[in-house]
Amino acid sequence: MNALALNALLPTPSQQFLLFDVDDTFTQHAQLDAQALDALWRWRESGRHAIAVTGRPAGWCDHFARMWPVDGVIGENGAFWFRYDRAARRMARRHLGQPAPGPELGVRLKQAQDCILAEFPQARLSADQAYRLYDLAIDFCEDVEGLTLADAHQIAHRLRQLGMTAKVSSIHVNAWFGEHDKCTTSRHYLQECHGLTVAQLDHSVVYVGDSPNDEPMFQAFPLSVGVANVKPHLPHMRHPPRFLTTSAEAKGFVELVNHLLA
């Protein structure tokens, strides 16, 4: 299925929930973008809801939930969600990843790490691995050079051979033990925290992302949007986004928000 231009997505009052990937969707050239942050504030000030859905680690997600204008954060590709109540000054944390963090999981992740780094010596352990609870993040282009997108998919394939779920993002290959993903936990969050029914999800939620680890979301939500830099990944996707922005990265995020608020 070929993606449609963004103007084919008709804004409606029922579109109350914007779920968005972070790296290379909400960021521009690996940094927070002032226009994207302004767009997120405008979305929230319109009375609507925003939830970040990211592969980034628990330590970062605590910060996102506290400091950003979002209702909640789904992190480590669906291992958990965090939701900060500013009035009560309390963080709600729900962990859905299995197995639970601990020494046994740490040993299994280290074994997978050692295998990948031995077989793909140009790859590196992600710099944010120390802040993760559930998954292994292999850096193929954030802080390293010399690896291609094809290499990233080879790494993901090898991790699957080791019995892990593996997804390629725009910067990392993330792998974990268990069946959760961005979609399963997004549905759980929306149903538990906002009371949405399965039927309501289809017309209430807009999702925007940029890479193969967003594919479960692109498949699940009819109102799925890819920022323009998703295009190199489309040949690797069985379930592409339904709509595409003309701009890449954060500029595409701004384009989407402006379109929905028009």
Where do the PLM segments sit?
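Mg2+-dependent phosphoryl-transfer enzymes with acidic/Ser/Thr/Gly-rich catalytic loops
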Residues: 8-9, 13, 33, 183-262
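Conserved acidic, metal-coordinating active-site core of Asp-based
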Residues: 112-206, 211-220
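Short, structured coil segments at secondary-structure junctions
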Residues: 68-69, 77, 162, 220-221, ...
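Non-catalytic pre-domain segments flanking phosphatase-related domains
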Residues: 1-20
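Residue-level marker for buried hydrophobic side chains located in beta-strands
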Residues: 18-20, 73, 207
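Active-site phosphate-binding/coordination module
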Residues: 32-128
